[in-house]
Amino acid sequence: MSASLVTEEMTVPSEPGIDIFVRNKRLASHAVFTAERTVLFVHGSTYPAHTGFDIPLGGQSWMDNIASRGYDVYCLDVRGYGRSTRPKAMSEPPQNNPPLARTPDAVKDITAVLNFILKRRGIAKLNLIGWSWGCSLMAITAIQNPDKVVRLVQYAPGWLRTTPSLLNAGPGPLGA
């Protein structure tokens, strides 16, 4: 990687007692921030953001690649993932609790970080990129905040398939 990148890590409050981990990468020389060149990544339901967007494969992560091209790049961990607040329910047996990060709560986390970035950079909009479950989360966030989104990018959305649905496999056993 030839360009010098700055990495910052911070937390953003979402709700009382819930802090969301955020990582930011940008060129060290980056001083002017614009809506068109600011990006927020959100992970799916399995792994936190940095493991999907900031693992340096071949020496450079996806975040590094975009940041080295002049973008101000952020990723966040939804509550219960990675370095964000671990809900109390995670200390109890799983059968005692519903899923930890439900979609409405995750959208609150994303919206809190979205508003934080807009205020921090003095911009009115930014680009959203979601992966898997993050596609659903980012779509809802974009619908609820259309005036704050330049573009919505969906990477591997869960509802688009090129193979027949297993729910409609026809008569007989699935063979699993």
How would you describe each model-predicted region?
Residues 104-125:
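Conserved acidic catalytic loop of the alpha/beta-hydrolase fold
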Residues 130-134, 138:
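Gly/Ala-rich beta-loop-alpha elbow adjacent to hydrolase catalytic centers
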